[in-house]
Amino acid sequence: MTDSTVSSAKSDPVLVNHEERLGVHSLAVDAIDQVLMNSKLHYLGNAARIIEPMRHLAILTCMDARIDVSALLGLRPGDAHVIRNAGGRASTDALHALAISQAVMHTCEVMVIHHTDCALGRFSQAQLDEQISAASGHRFAEELGCFTDPIGAIAQDVASLRASPYLPARDKIRGFIYDLSTNLLTEVSSRDRTPN
């Protein structure tokens, strides 16, 4: 196969998808390029429109790839805003997203979903600092959201969001823990535990 043949094959999403289905990995295609190709095939002709989430719901959860929010909650595209970060913590960036979600897109309910076996519960701030520093040569000045008490962390995040003046709809903010081993979602009251 010549270089020009490889180049044209890489740009052919049908060929790449066919090879993926067959389990053939002869083409060196980056993961991002692959999902972009899949996106073009899957949504061909379906132009996106800016709409308010149909359920007026925002979900703050962890970036962990094991959590399929749509499958877990039975959501379809357009149902809810899904905001993800490390740990599903109520960080400044999460608050910004929720404030925009409520003010611009009129969401009025928030689910905060943490999960079992979360990296932020398994590593300390110092351990994560060390790993990030070793990989990048830099350290974050701010806390990364590590916790030792999962229930307390959810309670802390829910309480923090309920107290935020930037969220006009604060009465329907609820916290949950998702058990990865059982696939069960359990509600946690913000008064269940006091975080460490």
Q: In which residue ranges do the predicted regions lie?
A:
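Residues at the starts of beta-strands that form the adenosine-phosphate
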Residues: 56, 109, 172
